[in-house]
């Protein structure tokens, strides 16, 4: 799936969530700022004009995350975190802070090993969740994530262009 299709697919999920929550605006939280996709999605939300499909979406919290043993994460984190700061998006200190501030969450951490841990509080709080690639580092973790979503009746979505 190419980047444009992925963005349309994510946007559709968030619009569905937007309609389900029946809100005039939707507060989006971002977990994992160590890749360009987190910036791309945040930029789409922050720059939508009234009347456009993503109007009313606002990124209200961003938790950097990062994995010290993944070179791409180490190299990308400062660069992409700075872009979030340039957009005026508040940086928070934990996943719990994101959950507290957001209506919906996008989990964009490069490291699939942390996805179950990062997704758990989001799903337990009943916040709709999109997980970027990879869904998780193992099938066992993927199944646990979906079990949590089902147990807490929380919308969950993931996809990849690769």
What are these regions (language model features)?
Residues 136-162:
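A contiguous active-site-proximal alpha/beta segment in oxidoreductase catalytic domains
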Residues 1, 20-21:
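Short, intrinsically disordered, low-complexity terminal segments
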Residues 13, 23-125, 143, 151:
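N-terminal glycine-/serine-/threonine-rich beta1-alpha1-beta2 phosphate-ribose binding loop
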Residues 126-128, 133-134:
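Short helix/strand-capping hinge loops at secondary-structure junctions
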Residues 93, 131, 156-158:
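Hydrophobic residues in well-ordered beta-strands that form the structural core
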Residues 1-9:
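Bacterial N-terminal signal peptides that target proteins for export
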Residues 8-19:
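Bacterial N-terminal signal peptides
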């Amino acid at each position: 799936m190419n980047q444009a299709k992925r963005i349309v697919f994510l946007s559709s999920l968030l619009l569905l969530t937007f309609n389900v929550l029946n809100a005039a605006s939707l507060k989006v939280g971002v977990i994992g700022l160590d890749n360009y996709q987190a910036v791309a999605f945040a930029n789409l939300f922050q720059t939508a004009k009234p009347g456009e499909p993503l109007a009313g979406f606002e990124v209200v919290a961003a938790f950097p995350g990062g994995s010290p043993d993944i070179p791409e994460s180490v190299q990308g984190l400062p660069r992409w975190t700075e872009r979030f700061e340039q957009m005026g998006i508040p940086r928070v200190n934990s996943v719990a802070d994101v959950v507290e501030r957001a209506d919906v969450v996008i989990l964009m951490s490069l490291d699939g090993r942390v996805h179950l841990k990062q997704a758990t509080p989001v799903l337990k709080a009943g916040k709709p969740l999109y997980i970027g690639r990879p869904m998780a580092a193992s099938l066992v973790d993927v199944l646990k994530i979906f079990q949590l979503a089902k147990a807490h009746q929380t919308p969950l979505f993931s996809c990849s262009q690769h």
